[in-house]
C-alpha cells in the first residue's frame, strides 16, 4: 500500500510541476509561429505589382497593410517586452517594394519573438504606454497584438482573394 501511495504522490507531484506557470504568455508564444507563418506567406503570395492595389479608394493599399503589420508588431512588441521600439534608419514606406517589406515583416516577427521571451504572466498588470499616449496594462498590449494578427490576416486574405489568389490557409496541403 505504501508503494502505491508513493507512486501516486510521485505522479501527482510530476503533474503539478508540469503545469505552466505562465499560461497567458505561453499561449501567445504558441500562437506567434502560426501567425508569423500565415502573415508572411500572405504577403509573399501577393505579386509585387499588386502592392499598390486597394479594394476601394477609402481602403489602404496592400503595401500599406504590410507596412501597418510591421509597425504594429514593432510597437506592441516593444511595449510587451519592455524593449526600445525598432526604428529603421530610413523609415519604411508602403511603396518600398515587396522584397523590402517582406524582409521588414520577417524582422518584425523576430523582434516579437525576442520581446515575448522577456515577459511572463507576472508582468501582465504592469502599466505601459499605448497608442496616443494612453496608459494600459501589458496584458492589454498582448491581447491587442493577437487581435491585430487575426485582423491583419483576414484583411490580407481578402486582398488576395479579390486578386484571384488563395490565402495560405486556404491553399491545398503540399
Model-predicted regions and their roles:
Residues 1-21:
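Bacterial Sec-dependent N-terminal signal peptides
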Residues 19-29:
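Short, low-complexity N-terminal intrinsically disordered segments enriched in polar/charged residues
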Residues 25, 59, 95-98:
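Structural motif corresponding to alpha-helix initiation and N-cap regions
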Residues 29-33, 37-40, 50-90, 129-174:
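Short, contiguous alpha-helical
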Residues 38, 42-43, 77, 111, ...:
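Well-ordered alpha-helical scaffold segments within catalytic/enzyme domains
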Residues 94-129, 136-152:
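Acidic/histidine-rich alpha-helical segments that form the ligand environment
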